[in-house]
Design a protein with these regions (language model features):
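Glycine-rich phosphate-binding loops of nucleotide-dependent enzymes
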Residues: 1-200
Length: 200
């Protein structure tokens, strides 16, 4: 905690403006866009706390985000595809309030991948989930780039989840980048081990 992970996401998604520097993705300056334009451009985000609306159905929760889709297409088809991709076995018309914690997290992922996003930001998506549900979620996250063509960025302090999902890893320690590169190499880095375990 305190490494700067959520602040990094807040800058990318437009909730925090940095004092200096730039943020570019796919050749586009994200800082020049209002946060709602970033959504239209194709930036999606999950949060540490659920954002799904309990009173609405699974379908309607995902469909709300489809309004920011960067491509045309069948709204219903796109929404059902996102729900299926996330591996949600709930009835799309079921109220979100009837779902367990793991299924709710999958609703968040479906909201993040609907409408062919360019960048998907996942903020501690497995927090509080048991191992079995975390394993399923990790498999879904791993498939996001292939399924959507999007760049998926995961922030988490669960190194087993990072290892399972990420080919490239960057490590922040109190706001400073201390290592980046292939995940396996980064997780063996002495500076990373010291920062996370206090030993080298």
């Amino acid at each position: 905690n305190g490494a700067g992970k959520t602040t990094f996401f807040n800058v990318l998604s437009g909730f925090v403006r940095p004092a200096a520097g730039s943020v570019r993705a796919f050749g586009v300056d994200l800082l020049s866009m209002a946060h709602f334009r970033r959504a239209r451009w194709g930036l999606r985000r999950t949060f540490q706390t659920e954002q799904a609306i309990e009173e609405l159905s699974v379908f309607d929760n995902v469909a709300m985000v489809h309004e920011h889709s960067r491509q045309g297409g069948s709204r219903r088809g796109d929404v059902l595809d996102a729900i299926a991709f996330a591996g949600l076995d709930a009835d799309p018309e079921a109220s979100v309030r009837t779902l367990g914690a793991g299924q709710r997290r999958l609703v968040e992922v479906a909201r993040a991948v609907v409408g062919r996003p360019r960048v998907v930001l996942l903020d501690e998506p497995a927090a509080g989930l048991p191992d079995e549900e975390t394993s399923h979620l990790a498999e879904v996250i791993r498939r996001i780039p292939e399924h959507t063509g999007a760049l998926a960025i995961l922030v988490d302090h669960d190194m087993s989840l990072v290892s399972a999902c990420c080919t490239t890893t960057a490590v922040l320690d109190f706001g400073k980048l201390i290592a980046s590169g292939p995940t396996a190499a980064v997780l063996r880095d002495d500076a990373v081990i010291r920062a996370y375990l206090g030993v080298a």
